[in-house]
Amino acid sequence: MILQTDIENLPYRSNVGLMVLNKSGEAFVAQRLEYYANAWQMPQGGIDPGEDAQEAALRELEEETGITRDKVTIIAETQGWITYELPPDLISKLWDGKYRGQKQKWFLLRFFGEDNDINIETEEPEFSAWKWIAPSALPEVIVPFKRDVYVAVLEAFQDHL
């Protein structure tokens, strides 16, 4: 078992998150395959060494959703990092127990492709289903420990929604 003092000494994992809006202004969410399987989330993923946040965002978008960079436009990004803590029971299960949570740079993207451009059956699938929802509904569908992140993302992008 990991002690609270040990958790506090762990770093945050650098990560990007993507709010992808369709032509109707709805946000893309997908249902996780593993641990909180009933949870829906927006695409997100780690930043590889030597990669900047924008490059990571576009790479993760394609890896997780099949959406290619020629089908999106970046509209905005968060000014700073938004952090969240993992629940203690997940720390040892994710990323070899090396991180206490994640610090995320979020990007708002406009998707101008068609729904058939989306393919979650990727090389390393993370999702079992996807849908478009109203941005205001995002905090209701995410796991509780990420809810504050989604509220902060909505606030950061409110002028563009």
Question: Locations of the language-model features?
Answer:
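Acidic, metal-coordinating catalytic segment for phosphate/diphosphate chemistry
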Residues: 1-21, 96-97
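Entry beta-strands of beta-propeller and related beta-repeat scaffolds
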Residues: 26-27
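Residue-level signal for short, function-critical loop segments
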Residues: 33, 46
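Unchanged
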Residues: 47-144
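Charged phosphate-binding loop/patch that engages nucleotide di/tri-phosphates or the phosphate backbone
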Residues: 135-161
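A short gly/proline-enriched turn/hairpin at secondary-structure junctions
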Residues: 41-43
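A conserved beta-turn-beta hairpin within the catalytic core of GNAT-like acetyltransferases
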Residues: 35-38
